[in-house]
Amino acid sequence: MGLPWYRVHTVVLNDPGRLIAVHLMHTALVSGWAGSMALYEISVFDPSDPVLNPMWRQGMFVIPFMTRLGVTKSWGGWSITGESVSNPGIWSYEGVATAHILLSGALFMAAIWHWVFWDLELFRDPRTGEPALDLPKIFGIHLFLSGLLCFGFGAFHVTGLYGPGIWVSDPYGITGSVQPVEPAWGPEGFDPFNPGGIASHHIAAGILGILAGLFHLSVRPPQRLYKALRMGNVETVLSSSIAAVFWAAFVVSGTMWYGSAATPIELFGPTRYQWDQGFFQQEIEKRVQGSLASGASLSDAWAKIPEKLSFYDYIGNNPAKGGLFRAGAMNSGDGIAAGWLGHPVFTDKAGNELFVRRMPTFFETFPVLLVDKDGVVRADVPFRRAESKYSIEQVGVSVTFYGGELDGVTFNDPSTVKKYARRAQLGSVFEFDRATLQSDGVFRSSPRGWFTFGHLWFALLFFFGHIWHGARTIFRDVFGGIDPDLDDQVEFGAFQKLGDVTTRRQAV
């Protein structure tokens, strides 16, 4: 059968045994990829500095998903939190990866078995002996089993009743760890940033799935509904399955890009909106003002700011800064963060404190402007020095660092002041090692950006797939045309109803 590449799935259209085989093989490939990718990531991952060199800066993609489900230790003796471990147990990163590879092998063998032994009695209607599938019953079975799995995950794994719990952190991504979660049954459960909603929604959705599965197993669909929704056609199953998948892809694209309890910033990096809204900057300022109010010096106040919080407040960690087609991890762009230099305070020769205006997300270059507390521009780094009125040299700007590695150091020479003004544009000032990875200085996106981009495209593609296959199954009679096996000659005008020999027109 000479089929073009885009029609090859026709071979399993009326072959339930081999339909199962190709699904088993597909799951084997997915499971095998996940396990192999996990082992690769573990082999290149550097766990030594979870603060300045976290997994999302290193371009890890599957490790964050394993971690959010409760896997934090390695057979290599390290933990995701940076400490050493002596007994990681079976369910370490390597253990989970190995389990996926073993599952892949088992599924591979099952796929071969079902491809060879495709013509099973199970797939034949006992009344007619013809191949037939009871699709509404199969739907009920799948709904029941997926509901059971969903309920089990929410009631046991997430709550810690029989499992580790999930990754839970504070809004600023400082204190994250794997812990049991109490289900949230009130309105607070609908807050996308409340981990309690993950437990309660899985429990509720699981119960609904179990009940719906039992309903579809015990109640047959009405004949008219069966025919109207083409429930006897396996392409209907394909179309509705694609609909479920594209909807899920759209939803997870949103929860990943905008952030949620299921996508913690410690594992996937900050969102672009946290930079746009000055989320971390405001929290840092609040903490500093609190320390100053309690009598601390400016140096002490800034020294109390966690380095982790400062690092989030850096534009290079914004997933929207990396171009979609710039391959590589964030560390391949601006380098590996080596240390926080401190908070720079700029002053002019009159003693006015100046603030560097931060670069917006969608700018590659932005003028370096230093404004006073009223927002008036007092100094800048001009594009054309001949026309400059507010240059660093003319205004006499100096910079003093508080907290960090340069605590208490003041720079007066214009070239150094301009260097730190340019870097203050990008948020917190950090020193980067660009030599180790031969980083090119061009920002990259985080796994948050890759996941969103990939799943949005998958969702769009699958949306059109749903429309295509849905139209094919609903309008199958139209596309199929008139049955060539009709004994009577069919012609327009011969019958009142085309092809119905009982409605032959009488000659006048």
UniProtKB/Swiss-Prot annotation:
Cofactor binding summary note: Binds multiple chlorophylls. PSII binds additional chlorophylls, carotenoids and specific lipids.
Taxonomy of the source species: Eukaryota, Viridiplantae, Chlorophyta, Nephroselmidophyceae, Nephroselmidales
Location (main, coarse): plastid
Protein name: Photosystem II CP47 reaction center protein
One MF annotation (Gene Ontology) recorded for this entry: electron transporter, transferring electrons within the cyclic electron transport pathway of photosynthesis activity
UniProt key word Transmembrane: yes
Localization per Swiss-Prot or TrEMBL: Plastid, Chloroplast thylakoid membrane
SUPFAM superfamilies from the UniProt entry: Photosystem II antenna protein-like
Gene designation per UniProt: psbB
Protein role: One of the components of the core complex of photosystem II (PSII). It binds chlorophyll and helps catalyze the primary light-induced photochemical processes of PSII. PSII is a light-driven water:plastoquinone oxidoreductase, using light energy to abstract electrons from H(2)O, generating O(2) and a proton gradient subsequently used for ATP formation.
Organism for this UniProt entry: Nephroselmis olivacea (Green alga)
UniProt entry keywords in alphabetical sequence: Chlorophyll, Chloroplast, Chromophore, Membrane, Photosynthesis, Photosystem II, Plastid, Thylakoid, Transmembrane, Transmembrane helix
